[in-house]
Amino acid sequence: MKITSLHFLIFHKNLNYVSSKVKAKKIFYQRALNNIYLCTIRTMIVDIAEIKKRDNHALDTQESQELVNKIKEIKNSDEQNNSNNNNNNSSSSNFCSNNNSPFSHKETKLMVKEEVPNSIVKNILNNNSCATSIINNKFYTQINNIIPVKPEAMKEENINVSTVNTENDISKEKKENSHYFCDEIKVMKKEYSKDDFVTDVKLEMNDKEEEEEEKQKIGQESTHINIKVEKDTFNECNNSNVNEKKRNRSVDIHNELSNKRILTEDVVVKCNIKNDVKIIVTWNMNSITVRYKNKKKWDEFMNFFNNLNADVLCFQEVRLPAMNLSEPCDNKNKNKNKNDGIRDRGKIKNSDQKSLADYEIMEQILNDDFKDYNAYFSLANIKYSGQLVLVKKNIHIESIRYNLFFENNAHIHHDEGRVILVEFSNFFLLSTYTPNNGFDHVKFERRRLFDEQLQKFVTILRNEKQKPLVWTGDLNIAPEDIDLSHPAEFRRMKKGNVPKEFIGQPGCTDFERKNFQKILTAGNLVDSYRYLQNIKLNEDKKNNIKHTPNINDNIYTWRCPFLLGKSCNKAMRIDHFIVSKEFLNRINKIHIQGFSVFHNNFYGSDHCPVILYLKNE
């Protein structure tokens, strides 16, 4: 017995308008009934309710190609219409529709299995990136750069798919009164590249006996379907790609269709890509746009970056303003850009001439220099603080969080963009730009609150999550005197009358060191660089090898930017990789890139990159 057709149409949805769903339905659903297409998109819609629309035949090769071409036509037409209707500068408009753009909210979207009231579903349809936060924080990541390809040169691959029975058409009255459900769709692969693509789908029903057994296993009326999926291989692949082992893929589709349908316009595809993170870089850039404008220094950095081939880059102090979502309350207020108006901290501001210049610089950086990476921003209101995390597109991310709380509010950013938590398959990566302790009581209190929140956060992470933590970034702490170039001078610095625990250069006071040790204890964490250095020193002692620390050695991550004056030549190690103790066996080495009082390999910043190399699991 044959099931005549089953189709999940996945298509581009530009964030500039909402009508594309309705428009695309009318065009595609008449014939696209027995195919799965994964298009070159970032935001996708999967409408499971359309399963009920059936045809009596599968599309042949020619019809399949016609459908792909039609999808491309509509996508290009929609993008052109949006560009014409947009009031912004043409360059920024085009960039917003770019699939690689972080400005179209390239954050992990969430999908739920609980009942979702109709009012929230409407919010999701109309508000795109923000509305999903209303529901809860079950995270499912986006799938990027999956390309529709020609149906020639196909290779067959068997895939088992389980689904539940399809009901008759849902009446209009039921639709209006019912709740909607978001169920899970998984695309699981050991490796992933844009060469992989799912096309023609053929369905066959099992015998009745097997069907009854399947019903008992699942505990509900269901149909087990075997799907034969054809996979394209590009003729233009490199020889190395041609000789690669076949990638294993399994697709698990399990949606209850009785009074249920997927209506979210966020990604509901979870892509498990078995690529381990091997190299992580952290760097306080001290303004990414300023670094870029110094062509010589930027070229030096890009040469270092290209040779390194890092999997993850954590940039602190990028100094980009967050995008305005509303006008300030008081237009006469001179400080309105600092305090007023609602912001989207995951996007860059481009509403005035000054911010547009930085916006266009970032467009060029991300589309040219970091085109193989997904970008995750967390920004302050003004050109201050802020972070950017770049993750290779072939690395699977399970979730993203932008604060130090574990309520259902992962989308809410720290108001200065100081926290980004990325969950990978086998560990958490926390990047922070920890507040500087400063020299006054206001900043002392700000640092105390941040450290307290961080201590609670790592405690919960240790007790409730079953993954180790890698905490990196500009932590603004030199844990020991050995991390200071001039310990005596650093430790006696102060401004005004302050308690003894606050005496010292920010980053090395007793107050900060005490709180830092509390965080390490609470999270069962270790300063991995110092741990490895101590092992090396002990081995050298056994071999009678003596080391005399030198100001020019690559043992400090921050150096005073002034080459003259009383502060010149001073340096500290305040950028770190702090890891869970059980993660120490994964560390191969840690390298501090910068050296010398002349700031070699600092690439124009007052901080240098620090690189963590991980072993294979």
UniProtKB/Swiss-Prot annotation:
- What protein name applies here? DNA-(apurinic or apyrimidinic site) endonuclease
**Which Gene3D superfamilies does its entry note?**
Endonuclease/exonuclease/phosphatase (3.60.10.10)
Q: What does this protein do?
A: Multifunctional protein that plays a central role in mitochondrial DNA base excision repair (BER) pathway induced by oxidative stress. Has apurinic/apyrimidinic (AP) endonuclease activity towards double-stranded DNA (dsDNA). Has nucleotide incision repair (NIR) activity; acts on dsDNA with oxidized bases thymine glycol and 5,6-dihydro-2'-deoxyuridine. Has 3'-5' exonuclease; can use dsDNA templates with 3'-OH termini including blunt-end, gapped and mismatched 3'-recessed.
* Activity regulation (UniProt): Apurinic/apyrimidinic (AP) endonuclease activity is maximal at low Mg(2+) (0.5-2 mM) with no activity seen at high concentrations (more than 10 mM). 3'-5' exonuclease activity is maximal in the range of 0.5-2 mM Mg(2+) with activity seen up to 10 mM Mg(2+).
The molecular function terms of the Gene Ontology recorded here are: DNA-(apurinic or apyrimidinic site) endonuclease activity; double-stranded DNA 3'-5' DNA exonuclease activity; endonuclease activity; metal ion binding; phosphoric diester hydrolase activity; RNA exonuclease activity
The answer on whether this UniProt entry bears the keyword Metal-binding reads yes
Provide the reaction this enzyme catalyses: Exonucleolytic cleavage in the 3'- to 5'-direction to yield nucleoside 5'-phosphates
SUPFAM superfamilies, alphabetized: DNase I-like
Question: Which cofactor does the UniProt annotation name?
Answer: Mg(2+); Mn(2+)
Main subcellular localisation: mitochondrion
What keywords are annotated for this sequence in UniProt? Answer: DNA damage, DNA repair, Endonuclease, Exonuclease, Hydrolase, Magnesium, Manganese, Metal-binding, Mitochondrion, Nuclease, Transit peptide
Q: Where in the cell is it found?
A: Mitochondrion
Instruction: State the residue spans of region: Disordered.
Output: 74-99, 326-349
**How is the polypeptide modified once translated?**
May be proteolytically cleaved into a 64 kDa form.
What EC numbers are recorded for this enzyme?
A: 3.1.11.2
**At which positions is Mg(2+) bound?**
284, 317, 474, 476, 606-607
Which residues catalyse the reaction? Answer: 607
Species whose genome carries this gene: Plasmodium falciparum (isolate 3D7)
